[in-house]
């Protein structure tokens, strides 16, 4: 198959869909790989690295879309990219459609075969293609949040890790999944006071076993969330409902309870955010202030560390891409129900129920869709 890797064009998105090593693997399997000129430059990959791996360098994204059977990206296509997706063409990337009505309609109109990294599952119900980027975003949430607490960033002027004889700040993490766990790794390492809120008692027990008395586990049914966020210097939103819009856990009214100069990092923003006042921002202009609270809501946080992120992403996506290219999507998805869960849009039909429900589209099961 011909596999195309266009340059990412989302603002300040500098990752790329394939590393040169991944290209080498695909070429070794007998496939042709087209990479856009300088597509990997910001992630530290030169054109020469790709040509040495067997790729062809293409000057224009349009030519890659026109000539490829599979398009491999990192972030969801922007609307001018959606227009280039052809009927029956496979798109393999993050999509986050539950928070993107116009994109969803565009992909329906394209009649392409759209497989989302973030809804592919594993045998345990985990999200193996989302996990590495969630880990990166979770760790970055504390780094970025700590920076935003500085006075010249609009924060309260607090050093999150404290100083000799001076207590550090308080971090409240909503959600104990991959984002929350990785946020806690950095926050506890900085010696902040860390609360983790989750609805699962079992998950909190796992986190307590990992972190010991470095965290304060809080079962969501048993806490006064208003009181807890009023104590937070840094609030991290890391709640996820797979493939669906994130629940709004913190309302605008609750925001008024937070300290002046405190910080919110809403990692869930690519699924709509779990804070009512959140709105997507970019690495170029990452923050805004509402009611004296700094909001950091960059929708592609791992794009700020493209080299680490691209390697981490390829480590998990490549085996699935090899299956797609070697077997074709119908066989690859048909023999693996966990991979099939990644199919969100198929030839004009929405095949992921949470997306169909949120926008009122007719739902066609992925299993039925690939038979046609």
Positions of the model-derived regions?
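Short acidic low-complexity segments
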Residues: 54-67, 218-229
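Adenosine-phosphate binding glycine-rich loop
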Residues: 118-159, 168, 269, 274-372
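A short helix->loop->beta-strand "cap" motif at the edges of active sites that frequently abuts
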Residues: 31, 86-89, 109-112, 259-262, ...
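Short glycine-/small-residue-rich Rossmann-like dinucleotide-binding loops
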Residues: 69, 75-76, 95-96, 221, ...
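Metallocofactor- and cofactor-centric catalytic cores in central/energy metabolism, strongly enriched
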Residues: 12-13, 21, 25-32, 45, ...
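Glycine-rich phosphate/diphosphate-binding loop of Rossmann-like nucleotide-binding domains
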Residues: 6-7, 11-44, 152-240, 287
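Rossmann-like adenosine-cofactor binding region
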Residues: 209-291
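Phosphate/diphosphate ligand-binding glycine-rich loop within oxidoreductases
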Residues: 66, 70-149
